[in-house]
Amino acid sequence: MFIVAVLMLAFLIFVHELGHFTIARICGVKVEVFSIGFGKKLCFFKLFGTQFALSLIPLGGYVKLKGMDKEENGMNETTDDSYAQKSPFQKLWILFGGAFFNFLFAILVYFFLALGGEKVLLPVIGDLDKNALEAGLLKGDKILSINHKKIASFREIRSVVARARGELVLEIERNHQVLEKRLTPKIVAVISDSNDPNEMIRYKAIGIKPDMQKMGVVSYSLFQAFEKALSRFKEGVVLIVDSLRRLIMGSSSVKELSGVVGIVGALSHANSLSMLLLFGAFLSINLGILNLLPIPALDGAQMLGVVFKNIFHITLPTPIQNALWLAGVGFLVFIMFLGLFNDLTRLL
């Protein structure tokens, strides 16, 4: 499974670079090199004017676009298939292409898994508190709908309750009979993962817990599967952005960072193909978002450079750009080794 995990990580990098490659070709830009990995090229072949390579250090990848390096150095490239000759919108689209393909891959994984049937906890009550008891709910009740929205799995209950306002109308099945119950959610406050008493997470709850023995497979129509895929993608984005926010604000410890060892280790613990794909989809979203951060050497900083140059007409001198790029690479290497250190510390 470890080898499969490494291949999954390499595949996600391939997907990212394929995004840059595909959008560049659509925009009419020649791609000179498509490499998985950095450093010395271990093997390569040329096809349709592009050199495809596998390089020594498999911690990323890159595509080399015609005219991109010359533009960065302030030189002119006049041929039509040059990156330098493209419009600001096309440049932004090419730079965003990697993250876009990562996001698209995640959505497609979620879509096809939902379409093929998803193993879920059924919405059967295993335990309940006073609020639910007073509303007339009992252990073993199966929730069919909330406010006339059908419920297929227990995880759907929380999102429906969170969006609802006021009293809820629950349709339940008990002893082969369909009953209607009404209750008002309570606001529950808990301390966040940062253990800071001042940082509380508040959410609505109706006071029920699932019966962990009640599992089932839920199938979805094409539209439902697409809706489910977008919902899971949104959940992943919110979770990753919130984690980054807490890390930047200092409410999360840098000890929580994971490196390549931790990521591959987590992937290798997936005990089924669907679990591996789900983790891979989440990691793909992560890869896409991280590459959009405005850190020199990442796509986000290059996109910011295009905006400043073409909209605000601000261009930094080449030596400063090179210095920022080196600083960005240094920062990323530091983060990589910090994650690796955390991984090894956990193993020891």
UniProtKB/Swiss-Prot annotation:
InterPro entries: PDZ_sf, Pept_M50_Zn, Peptidase_M50. Its main location: membrane. The active site is at E17. Its cofactor is Zn(2+). One of its GO terms (cellular component) is plasma membrane. It is a multi-pass membrane protein. One of its GO terms (molecular function) is metalloendopeptidase activity. Its EC number is 3.4.24.-. Residues 106-175 form the PDZ domain. It is found in: Cell inner membrane. The keyword Phosphoprotein does not apply. Pfam families: Peptidase_M50. Keywords: Cell inner membrane, Cell membrane, Hydrolase, Membrane, Metal-binding, Metalloprotease, Protease, Transmembrane, Transmembrane helix, Zinc. Zn(2+) binds at H16, H20. One of its GO terms (biological process) is proteolysis. The chain crosses the membrane at residues 43-63, 93-113, 247-267, 275-295, 324-344. It is an enzyme of class 3 (hydrolase). SUPFAM superfamilies: PDZ domain-like. Belongs to the peptidase M50B family. This is Putative zinc metalloprotease HP_0258. It comes from Helicobacter pylori (strain ATCC 700392 / 26695).
